[in-house]
């Protein structure tokens, strides 16, 4: 009899201070896909060097919204750093989108960016360049090795919390003060 598989989709991974990988140190990542082939997520608290206005310009999409043009594009992870990923919260689905949970979607479709530029897109959206990927069993091993804490995703944390506060606030949701933890782990 096989064990049921636990999905990590719609969970936030919070890097513990002992995280050995510099791509994820003090990082918060939303898991968007998780199955027997591996996992995919987007880092939510690393700003890239680009604004959304610069990305839209490169794509030939114009917008009159100064707020949209000034929005920081996230550095979503080391995999496909030249590819755009949009995480949005909406009742409407734009282009091919992956349901993460409870009205939260991930897409690489240009349609959602064009709709946002026109003012008809989702009002709550994050844009990232790149993503994070884990081979089959790799993320589970990292969890066992105490590299990550895990909490359910929360739209307020994703869309209403400043980038520099997401790491500590995510951990605070389960009562953990990351600044009180050491940067090494041990096993009994």
UniProtKB/Swiss-Prot annotation:
TM region(s), chain numbering: none
Pfam families the UniProt entry points to: DUF179
Entry's Gene Ontology cellular component terms: cytosol
Family stated for the protein in its record: Belongs to the UPF0301 (AlgH) family.
Source organism superkingdom: Bacteria
Stated name of the protein: UPF0301 protein Xfasm12_1428
Disulfide bonds: none
Record-linked Gene3D superfamilies: VC0467-like
Organism: Xylella fastidiosa (strain M12)
